[in-house]
């Protein structure tokens, strides 16, 4: 069971090469799982922020669950939606730090940090909320670094 977490995934959101990888790598591994053999047991899933620019696209989504993310001030709700991207189950993480940002990346580093810390922490809690065990957490670039750092605090680490 592999969970990819990424700030971009083409065709939903692509600013640069990270969007290419976020869209193509999970899809390529998913297609291997459909071929059978040694890869047939792969369960590939992807999580990306549910940016406002994705919300205005006409893609089918369904609400899955809410997760409370602890912050220094008070818990913030992360709402998790599901869609499919090239056959890959894709989770869209929504919540105040992500919702208030019109752009994927802004010039305000504090706002970007809050957005991606929130996203990373939500992704760590996502498998538990889904009753799904993750064997490998594939974190892409600095936007998901907090998730890797916080793995040490999880009782059942991927």
Annotated model-derived regions:
Residues 7-8, 141:
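Glycine-rich His-Gly loop
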Residues 8-21, 54-57:
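A short, glycine/small-residue-rich beta-strand->loop->alpha-helix junction that serves as a flexible
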Residues 14, 56-59, 146-151:
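A short acidic (Asp/Glu
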Residues 18-30:
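Short amphipathic alpha-helix
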Residues 32-33, 40:
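Conserved dinucleotide-binding and phosphotransfer motif residues
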Residues 37-39, 45-130:
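A conserved catalytic-core segment of Leloir-type glycosyltransferases
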Residues 116-158:
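Conserved nucleotide-sugar donor-interacting segment of glycosyltransferase catalytic cores
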């Amino acid at each position: 069971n592999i969970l990819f977490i990424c700030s971009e995934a083409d065709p939903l959101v692509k600013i640069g090469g990270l969007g290419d990888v976020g869209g193509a790598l999970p899809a390529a591994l998913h297609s291997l799982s459909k071929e059978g053999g040694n890869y047939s047991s792969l369960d590939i899933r992807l999580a990306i922020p549910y940016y406002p620019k994705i919300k205005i696209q006409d893609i089918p989504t369904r609400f899955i669950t809410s997760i409370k993310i602890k912050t220094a001030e008070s818990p913030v709700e992360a709402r998790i939606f599901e869609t499919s991207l090239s056959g890959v189950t894709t989770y869209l993480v929504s919540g105040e730090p992500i919702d208030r940002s019109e752009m994927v990346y802004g010039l305000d580093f504090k706002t970007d940090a809050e957005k991606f810390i929130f996203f990373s922490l939500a992704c760590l809690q996502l498998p538990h909320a889904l009753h799904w065990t993750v064997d490998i957490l594939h974190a892409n670039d600095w936007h998901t670094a907090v998730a890797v750092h916080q793995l040490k605090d999880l009782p059942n680490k991927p």
